[in-house]
Amino acid sequence: MRLIHTRTMDMEINGHEWWSWNGKTVWFDLQTPRSQVFWIAGVNVDTGKAVRYHIERDWWGVHFTSSRDDTLFANDGGDRSQVAYSTDGMWINLFREQPTQTVTREKLVNMSRHNYVTGRGGVEPNVHITPDKKWVVFTGQFAAGQRHVYAVEIAKVR
């Protein structure tokens, strides 16, 4: 067992970890502190080098993913009842890494009609970026009881 991230403050939370495609980086959602400052964070397991990309409150999502080269990230957004308490967070988001150690956000799909509340019949979108970086794939429930898999073409949204 190996420690990847150590908390640095009271109320700091991290979660929903995922591996980079090459297996060298553990990525995770980081909040310092909870519900206030948001990051896409990663730690290289070979070197221990950490990287953080700050994201705004409305950019936060429950589940994140990355492209094979870790230059694109996506998440599934969230509603007002979730930890970010965002007022405009119900989007499938795409983030592009910038040379300045930041990311830019692109809103791909308006999820305002989607039911995020799994305890009330909803579904978690659980986004994925295709290996060719052309699509973001996710599950959506835009009408009661109708869960489907969707794909949004990244290039078409730009």
Please annotate each region the language model reported:
Residues N44-G48, Q98-T100, A155:
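Short loop/turn segments that connect beta-strands within beta-propeller blades
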Residues V26-D29, L72-D76, W135-T139:
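Residue position within the beta-strands of beta-propeller blades
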Residues N22-G23, D69-D70, K133:
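Conserved loop/turn motif of beta-propeller repeat scaffolds
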Residues S35-A41, H54-K107:
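Loop/turn-rich, solvent-exposed surfaces of beta-rich toroidal or solenoidal domains
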Residues V123-R158:
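Blade-level signature of beta-propeller repeat domains, shared across WD40, Kelch, NHL, RCC1
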Residues Y53-H63, T102-P131:
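Conserved blade-ending motifs and adjacent loop-strand segments that build the rim/top face
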Residues M1-W60:
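Beta-propeller domains
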